[in-house]
Every structure is written in C-alpha cells, then in structure tokens.
Amino acid sequence: MGGSLGTVCTWPTLGWAIEAWGWSAALAACGGVALGWTALWWWVVRDCPATHPWIGEEELKYISERVQTKETAGAKKRLPPYKAILKSTPFWALVILHFGNMWGLFFLLTAGPNFITNVLAFDLGHTGILAALPYLARLILALIFGQIGDLIMKKKWMSKDAIRKGFVPISHILPGLLLAIQTLTGCDVNWAIVLITLSLGLNGASTLTNLQNAHDLAPNFAGTLYGIANCLGSATGFISPIIVGYLTSTHNGLHEWHTIFYIGSSVYIASGIIFWFFGSGDVQSWNDLEETANKRDVVGIENVSFDDVEVDKNDKKDRETR
C-alpha cells in the first residue's frame, strides 16, 4: 500500500505546485524524495530482525515466536525451482490476478488525471485532489480488510484458500462492475468521482488476495513469486497509457472513455474469474522441492534384501533349537 500512500501525498500538493512553479519543480521534488528514501532504506533495513542494531530483546522474541522460518545463520541459500514454478497453474492464476490489480492501479494513475481534467473539466489543482481520492479510499479500506482477514484467520472461520477466493469479488469483480457502471453516469461529475473512488477503494481487499497469495503458495520463495508477478503486472504501466492514447488521439470525449472504462472493467473481472477456477491458497509441493529430494538421499543405512531377512530368521531358529 506504499504506492497508494505516496499517491495520496503527492498529487494534491504537486497539482498546485505545477500551476505555481511548473513541471520542473514538481519533478525535482519527487526525485529528491526518492533519493532521500533510498538513503534511509540503506541505513535502516537489515536482512533479518536478529541482525538489526536497534531491535529490543522483547520485540525480537515477539517476532521469533510468531514467524516460522527454516533459514539459519550460515545456511546455504537454495535457488528457486523455476521449472516447477513456471509449470504451476496456481502461480499463473496469481500472475493473472495481480495483472488485473495492477491494470486498475496504473489505469487510474496514468489516465485518471486526463479524464478528470479533459472530460470532467477540472483545473489542475483540483484534479490532483480528486485523483488522489481513490487511492486514499484504497489505503483506508486496505487497513480495514486486513483487520477483517486477521480476525477470520484467528477465529479459523475460513481456510486460506477460501479467504483468497472469497475476497476476490471485493478486490476485483466489484471494482470492475463499478467501472462499467460509471459509463452510465454521463457528465455527472459527482457520480463519476464516487464510483471511481469506490472502485479503487474496494481494491484495497487485494491485501487478502493477490498481495498475499505468493506467500501462500511458497513461503520459501514468496519474494521470487511476487517479483515475477509484479514484473509482468507492471507492464500495464505502459500498456494502458498506449491504449488510452490511441483511443483518444482523434477525439477525447465520453464515447472514447466509455470504451476505456469497459476495457478496464473486463480486465478486472476476467482476472478474478480465472483465479476463482485455477487459483489456490495452499502451499505447493515445490516449495520444499530440495528437502524432498534430500530425503531420498539417505546416507549410512545398509541396504537389506528380503532374502537376507529370511536367512537371518532361519539362523535364529537354528540357534534356539540347539
């Protein structure tokens, strides 16, 4: 949700800054914040809690008791089983679900201000505020959905698989339907803003679907899975602007934007339906692929045939007879 928080902080302020000082000032401000954040990251972040210089004993104990990990100091790092990952149907269902999620994010991030300024006819300063509203809603609802998910897990009301698939209608299906409904509002500014805000806001439930599913499938390789899914999903950042630019190149009106919203709606809904049928919330067998292989390579145990066992039994009977 860091991207949503950044958008909420950036757009309302930069809209006015661009009107006052131009794009160069806005770009310089964003670049400065990014560099400052990078320096802070290198200074603060460590590989694991145990090596962090600022962590207290009580906090470290709390984390250690609640986080299960098989990694130990000096342990050999295992390469991800890429072949098994790429052959995994639940993994590709996750990739598609994440692609749909990223489409919604990048569509409103890149095309939202264009729609608000040129179709709804707002000035740039107000555009920044209005364009940030959907991301503020997403950030708030993500926290709420996260608490709901934790409660469900704690009470064991639903399995992980049921949670992931059960919240897909909220994170993907409903946002897609709301984008389609938005095309019926015409030039009604209030309804357009409300529906777009609610659409992306409900996508905050992605904290219980595509943003968590990589850890469900393979806790040992969750970073790799999410990295692949996010890489492919980020392609929407240049695909959706190309589509918007093509459809609005000759005329930037409601008819063209209706088509754009229908495309976004279709991607949302299709990705959710595919995950329903092919996704999973269970740990996959290839998560412990190397451990399974090692169990077969047992060292120091003598191979004994059934014939040898029979011979030993006969020898024992002879000794008892004597």
Spell out what each predicted region is:
Residues 1-20, 25-37, 101, 134-143, ...:
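Glycine-rich segments within core transmembrane alpha-helices of 12-TM secondary carriers
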